C-alpha cells in the first residue's frame, strides 16, 4: 500500500479535481504529484468519502473518490514537500496496523471498504 505522511499523520494520496477533469484522471495525477509514482493502472472504485475542514474562515465539504491502483515498475518515491508531505512509503499489509493508529477516520473507512 502506498501511504504518505502529511502534517504528522499517515494518509493516502489524494487531491482536488481540475475543472472538467475526470475523477479517474484526477486520482492518477494526484498520486503522481504527491509521490512521484507514474504508470499506474487504475482499478475499481473503492468508495466515496466526505469530510469537512475549516480553512480561511470557511467550512469546506470535500468528496473524495478512492480507487484501487496497481503498479508494475519499481520507482523511487518523491514526497511533494510543497504540500507538506514529509514521507511517502510502500507499506505491507502486516505493517499497516501501527500506522493506521495515526491517521484520519476517513482513511480507516477506505481501508475497511477495501476489505484490508
Task: Describe every region a protein language model picked out.
Residues 1-13:
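N-terminal strand-loop-strand
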Residues 17-44, 48-103:
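Unchanged
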Residues 98-116:
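Charged phosphate-binding loop/patch that engages nucleotide di/tri-phosphates or the phosphate backbone
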Amino acid at each position: 500500500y502506498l501511504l504518505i505522511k502529511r502534517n504528522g499523520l499517515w494518509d493516502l494520496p489524494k487531491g482536488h479535481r481540475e475543472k472538467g477533469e475526470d475523477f479517474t484522471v484526477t486520482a492518477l495525477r494526484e498520486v503522481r504529484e504527491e509521490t512521484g509514482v507514474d504508470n499506474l493502472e487504475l482499478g475499481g472504485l473503492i468508495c466515496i468519502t466526505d469530510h469537512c475542514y475549516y480553512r480561511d474562515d470557511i467550512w469546506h465539504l470535500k468528496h473524495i473518490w478512492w480507487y484501487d491502483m496497481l503498479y508494475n515498475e519499481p520507482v523511487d518515491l518523491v514526497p511533494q514537500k510543497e504540500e507538506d508531505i514529509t514521507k511517502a512509503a510502500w507499506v505491507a499489509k502486516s505493517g499497516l496496523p501501527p500506522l493506521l493508529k495515526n491517521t484520519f477516520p476517513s482513511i480507516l473507512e477506505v481501508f475497511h471498504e477495501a476489505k484490508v
